[in-house]
């Protein structure tokens, strides 16, 4: 079954022999913390990670009747399968299918502005905050970091495409066009590693715009 208008790359860009893991004593993105607290006269502790919040946007291109999503290598997913769980039998290579997204790391910019920047950098569409509709805000990794993600939706057209996308600096992001008519089947297919935000945003769209006819 073909879920995509374009064909996703089947070849990993990561050399398995080059991968190694080591303890992390410091990071620009996370801090390891331990909370001490009293709950109903019981002293407790909880280890957690201080991390940045994020934004993500579901892009829907009208002409193609497709959701524009991204595929990229996630080291944590790779390590989970090959180092922590040792379940190499699963069809997981560390690449995940996700919404266009980014960290909230620019104090002088609004969440909407950051979301628009990510749409341009990752997918090549130049949109503005007026294009965005808020889907909602959701906490992720509630037992580990409690980071907050704000989800947006934007209806786009081909004339907003100004570059091929793919990310900036050393990012290797693949832009994919997921057929709206196949989106539910894609969500249910466990052979494709995907994020909760991607599935939630697509389900939100399909419910809100259930009367849209396929192009």
Each model region followed by its residue ranges:
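A positional/architectural concept
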Residues: 1-63, 73
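Nudix hydrolase/Nudix homology domain
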Residues: 2-19, 95, 134, 144, ...
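Active-site-adjacent beta-strand/loop module that shapes the phosphate/pyrophosphate-binding cleft
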Residues: 31-42, 141-162
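A broad, low-specificity signal marking well-ordered, structured residues that form hydrophobic/aromatic
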Residues: 33, 46, 68, 97, ...
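Conserved Nudix-box catalytic region and its N-terminal flanking loop in Nudix hydrolases
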Residues: 46-49, 58, 63-117, 139, ...
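A contiguous pocket-lining binding segment that forms or flanks enzyme active sites
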Residues: 109-155, 169
């Amino acid at each position: 079954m073909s879920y995509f208008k374009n064909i996703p790359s089947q070849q990993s860009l990561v050399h398995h022999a080059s991968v190694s893991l080591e303890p992390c004593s410091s990071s620009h993105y996370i801090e390891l913390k331990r909370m001490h607290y009293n709950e109903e006269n019981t002293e407790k502790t909880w280890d957690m990670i201080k991390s940045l919040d994020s934004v993500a946007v579901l892009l829907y291109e009208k002409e193609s009747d497709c959701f524009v999503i991204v595929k990229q290598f996630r080291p944590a997913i790779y390590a989970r399968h090959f180092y922590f769980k040792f379940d190499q039998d699963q069809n997981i290579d560390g690449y995940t299918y996700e919404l266009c997204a980014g960290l909230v790391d620019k104090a002088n910019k609004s969440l909407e502005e950051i979301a628009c920047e990510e749409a341009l950098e990752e997918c090549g569409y130049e949109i503005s905050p007026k294009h965005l509709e808020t889907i909602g805000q959701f906490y992720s990794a509630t037992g580990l970091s409690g980071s907050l993600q704000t989800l947006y939706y934007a209806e786009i057209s081909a004339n907003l495409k100004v570059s091929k996308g793919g990310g900036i600096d050393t990012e290797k992001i693949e832009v994919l066009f997921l057929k709206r008519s196949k989106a539910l089947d894609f969500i249910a297919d466990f052979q494709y590693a995907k994020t909760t935000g991607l599935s939630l945003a697509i389900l939100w769209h399909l419910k809100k715009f259930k009367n849209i006819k396929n192009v």
